[in-house]
Amino acid sequence: MPKKILVLHTGGTISMQADDSGAVVTSQENPMNHVSNPLGGVEVHALDFFNLPSPHIKPKHMLALYQKIKEEADHYDGFVITHGTDTLEETAYFLDTMEVPHKPIVLTGAMRSSNELGSDGVYNYLSALRVVSDDKAADKGVLVVMNDEIHAAKYVTKTHTTNVSTFQTPTHGPLGLIMKYEILYFKTAEPRVRFDLDRIQGLVPIIPVYAGMTEELLDLLPVDQLDGLIIQAFGAGNVPKETSQKLNALIQEGLPIALVSRCFNGIAEPVYAYEGGGVCLQKAGVFFVKELNAQKARLKLLIAINAGLTGEELRAYMEG
């Protein structure tokens, strides 16, 4: 029997076209729906699930994708999601933390619209179909396929505003490569905690630190309306002295605060014991999130809060 793959189109550049002025605009009809399937033994069904530029994607849309995949799990052997690249990594990470079926799930997109010179959409789409129909993809977690590379949802990030090789995995490198005749994997997926949520809500902003930062910016936050806070810290995980004093006060008020590094490579860890250093921050109750960027750490905290995690259980999850 042929493998059945469900494609969920959500919009983004891969579905768009450039108009006469060169501006890229939303298309009424997704050009990927007209791409012929060259893969033998693979039956492709496509659904226009959303038609949104990815800056318009919210956690509620990510949850809807998860629920659709669960709903269709018994009818399909794998799932491809076409998505705008600006928030693709966040949707991929969200799905990777959910109790998705043990079947391949691949996200892909494009950096150039369908009628631009050098358009990459069709190639990435067909590459995603190749990966999702490959038996080796089933135990790799949620994947991102772009530009002949396969990346783990947890680690991949968009690194360039326009380059077709924008999706990279800092520190680790790609999970695998798409070759002319075969698909090669370097690594296996890591075990992870998964959740089955039926709602996702809450306010968790991201605050980057900078030289000379004081408590004034944090004072402007509507703390009584916040569910958590992500701090994008210096280096291994440090903040200015005045900022740390305010963070300590917020933690005392019961606000969960998680920290990542603003560095592109490396992992945040408590190293320095001066005021504002990571050692002091962790002792005060700040969670040090390993190997995630700020936008994914935000989703991780939001998911944990919606799953009802608190206290040491929340700390263990955020720092695990």
Positions of PLM-derived features:
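ATP/NTP phosphate-donor binding region
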Residues: 1-70, 245, 265, 288
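Accessory alpha-helical/coil subdomains and C-terminal extensions
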Residues: 2, 8-12, 28-38, 152-231, ...
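Short beta-strand segments
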Residues: 8-10, 81-83, 106-109, 143-147, ...
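Gly/Ser/Thr-rich loops at beta-strand to alpha-helix junctions
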Residues: 12-15, 84-89, 149-151, 235-238, ...
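A glycine- and small-aliphatic-rich helix-loop capping segment at beta-alpha/alpha-beta transitions
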Residues: 21-29, 93-105, 121-127, 158-164, ...
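Short Gly/Thr/Asp-enriched flexible loops that form oxyanion-binding sites at enzyme active sites
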Residues: 84-103, 239-248
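Internal gly/pro-rich beta-alpha loop/helix module
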Residues: 107-178
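ATP/nucleoside-binding phosphotransfer catalytic cores, i.e., glycine-rich phosphate-binding loops
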Residues: 241-320
